[in-house]
Amino acid sequence: MKRVIYKTIFCGLTLLTSLSSCSLDPKGYNLETKNSRDLNQESVILKENRETPSLVKRLSRRSRRLFARRDQTQKDTLQVQANFKTYAEKISEQDERDLSFVVSSAAEKSSISLALSQGEIKDALYRIREVHPLALIEALAENPALIEGMKKMQGRDWIWNLFLTQLSEVFSQAWSQGVISEEDIAAFASTLGLDSGTVASIVQGERWPELVDIVIT
């Protein structure tokens, strides 16, 4: 009788154990039940993960196109032809005042003063940027005060380098537009007592800093 009772109890415990095991995974951890909301969220996350690389690629291509357009716009701006004066026109009194103002400012003013005066300096530079390159250099060479100012600028590296860079860009544009002729070079060299062959070589090679050096030394 006792054996039957023990057997019945054992079978019952076995049944309860088997039922409870249905809520456990093989490793003994509780399985989490997921509702439809959780499943939908996981679906969205997986979809986003799949779409993210393609989105990044699209944005990258769009950025490259944007910067390419900007770069082309900048190039187009640089290629716009300037209305340079001829060498025979020389420079006007206003041009001389503007040139003196730019040189004296760059030679004498402190960095703070230059920053405060940058609007006036830019206006003066804009007005003289279309002066014929050789006429501009000739005006520098024939004015002792300007030569002295240029020498002071040489002692201020960043200002001098900036000046030469800007001057070279404008002069190279003039050369590319055919503004500087062989006759201009010959007349310029004759006026300043320079060798025309040397000047021609410098101009044709667009070695503008060298041209500045030979007229202020």
UniProtKB/Swiss-Prot annotation:
Q: How does it sit in the membrane?
A: Lipid-anchor
Q: Where is the lipid attached (N-palmitoyl cysteine)?
A: C22
S-diacylglycerol cysteine lipid sites: C22
GO cellular component annotations, sorted alphabetically? plasma membrane
Query: Does the record bear Lipoprotein in its keywords?
Result: yes
Q: Where is the signal peptide?
A: 1-21
Q: Chief subcellular site?
A: membrane
Q: List keywords of the entry alphabetically.
A: Cell membrane, Lipoprotein, Membrane, Palmitate, Signal
Q: Which domain of life is it from?
A: Bacteria
Cystine links in this protein are: none
* Compartments it resides in: Cell membrane
Q: Which family does it belong to?
A: Belongs to the chlamydial CPn_0875/CT_734/TC_0107 family.
> What's this protein's name?
Probable lipoprotein CPn_0875/CP_0994/CPj0875/CpB0904
